[in-house]
């Protein structure tokens, strides 16, 4: 028999389910009664933290979901999102090896094929009056396998359409079914205009609810991104009514939500917006509110009055590196979020262990390393009693170190935690270096910049390089005549939008020697060595706040994901001042990148402000305080 393995990350003990089969509880995942901003699952307060594939695990028969679910469980993650009746065409959104774009012969959907050819990319058209039992067998097994590993499945019933190409793949499109429905434009399909089409949608919703209501590890989302593509919110409310009726508790069944008028056995969520929006007058059956690309975590802060779980349910479009998404996760969950789901492009068919080497222009990231880091975050949150836990930055009244942003999470009277990261939100930043360049010999020089992302260079008041765009690492060059010993003004500007950052300034001298422009050739006002370096939050230089000014001897920065607070420039003696009640405490610092503990200390405190030395100001740092 396989028992759960106990893993240690520094001072944290984490459970990794190594194929262990959990016995389902009587009630499905629901709202935590003591604090309905979080979940309860199998008798335990729960936060959902995951890094999941691109939603095609069921509709793509080429995808080995057992291997995929094993990987999530081994990494300490407990959620996955799956689209039940939607596919994309290859190349959509520039996604390589998209698991949601299966080949036609590997596609399986809820409806059976008819005897008539004509589906848009081959195969027979669909008969919307008949179910494909092989599909529902695959769906049930997927949810069962997830449940055995303690993984919660979000079953997404519909998705908006993004244009003609996404609409023409769907069985509801008039050319893809034999039932005479779907004779409408892509931005009119998810509406109440065609009662016959709506009837097929209703039947599909009831069928899925009937198939999945026996599982305790399922939540339902009505529609992915209904704020795009003409989705009618009256239609959205109608589907909520149909689903709520199909999930109405029977004799002896408990309600997962807290609605007096629309009790349901399972939670139903609304995908509210990209970024943030203030939720007002939600449908009474909706008990969970999800956002996409929710950084900074304003969606949580603006909707605390809902007293319901808030999720950051899709990430991406911020480069392929781990750092932006790791910071997004810690920020969002420390702000009081209940769900974080990173869209992980390292999972594709044939690479269900999450080791696909996607191209640099993939619209997001994902990696084994990031999943371990997110598993560490999940384990960290499990050390808190979520029934008593709230975000509370009052802990930080004493201020935070310069150039640093912080979120704080507090278990009343018992535990306090602070997450510190560079103040440059989303890890995006811009920089300007100014000074003078003094050549060693007269002649024609070639100036070279290596950058990822944008770069601009002026020498002696003339712009030589202008590549102010989001691009992969590349070199740009320009020539200029310089006179030995004669200093000329130099200005170099750069922005980092995500991914693997790099900035280098080199030259090829008249004798053909190519090198980084040496520190001895660069100076500031008054002839002082080095360039003035100014660093700004965001990608637009002075439009974002300046968070750091320093002297840089040369411009030779393989930033990677470290950003301008690169580890070589961090100050280990920085102090954080926190406000605590009287008591005896154990303080422990963690590095969420390694991830590991950085050490512990004990102290007694009479109450009030208390300075605590930061063990490491790295890309991110976490402090946990426990009152004994």
Predicted regions and their residues:
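Acidic/polar, compositionally biased interaction segments
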Residues: 402, 425-572
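Catalytic-core region of carbohydrate-active enzymes that cleave or remodel glycosidic bonds
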Residues: 281-354
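Exposed aromatic-hydrophobic patches
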Residues: 476-480, 576-577, 608-615
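Active-site mouth of glycoside hydrolases
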Residues: 34-285, 297
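Bacterial N-terminal signal peptides
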Residues: 10-22
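Short strand-turn-strand beta-turns centered on an Asx-Gly dipeptide
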Residues: 42, 458-461, 590
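Boundary at the C-terminal end of the N-terminal hydrophobic targeting segment
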Residues: 24-26
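Aromatic- and carboxylate-lined catalytic core of secreted/periplasmic carbohydrate-active enzymes
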Residues: 325-425, 570-602, 613-628
